[in-house]
Amino acid sequence: MEAAVGYAADSLIKATELRLGLPGTADDLPSTPRGKKRAAAAEDNNANAAAADDDEHDAVEAAPPVAKAQVVGWPPVRSYRKSCFQQQSAAASKSKAAVSSCNNKDEPITKNAAPAPAASSAAAANGGSLVKVSMDGAPYLRKIDLRMYKGYRELREALEAMFVCFSGAADGANPSEFAITYQDKDGDLMLVGDVPFDMFTSTCKKLRIMKRSEATGLGSPRQMKI
């Protein structure tokens, strides 16, 4: 009897309970009190938060360790030392710039000065170099520098001083019996005085003092008297 009364009371409560839904539809699911719903929602939120915390912890453990960056300005340096360092660095940079500018200025000079030995050798080959002097009957050779003489007269006087027999001071030799000849760059034997002195110095390779009788035909009588 009591069970029947309880069942009737539950049916009455269920019939009069407000529900969300269309009229005439019945909810067979048992209704839960509001307090229980809130407790279940809180438990679900706590479970989700715990799962999210676990995921974040796992991600942090899996991530590589962050490199330690050096603290700027450590160890501390006093202000007067900083100023000294700055002055030294500025002076070093200025000295490097000065050295580089000097090197850049010296490069064209060295490039232009490189052909100097070739130019000097060419000048020595063209004229003014030492030439050998030989004399018929003399047992030795001499060398003279043609750049030291301004003309044929000075050259003859120097040759007379070199060879005593050619000047007539010994053995009673007569200077008029000898003639001065030279060998040019082509190897031809020519009489001294047939060309200007500058041309002679640039083409003369060897001097020879020979007897005038052997030099006949090499030049005019005026040239043979030089």
Curated annotation (Swiss-Prot):
One of its GO terms (biological process) is regulation of DNA-templated transcription. Residues 22-57 are annotated as: Disordered. Signal peptide: none annotated. Induction: By auxin. Keywords: Auxin signaling pathway, Nucleus, Repressor, Transcription, Transcription regulation. Pfam families: AUX_IAA. InterPro entries: AUX/IAA_dom, AUX_IAA, PB1-like. The keyword Iron does not apply. This is Auxin-responsive protein IAA12. The lineage of its organism: Eukaryota, Viridiplantae, Streptophyta, Embryophyta, Tracheophyta.
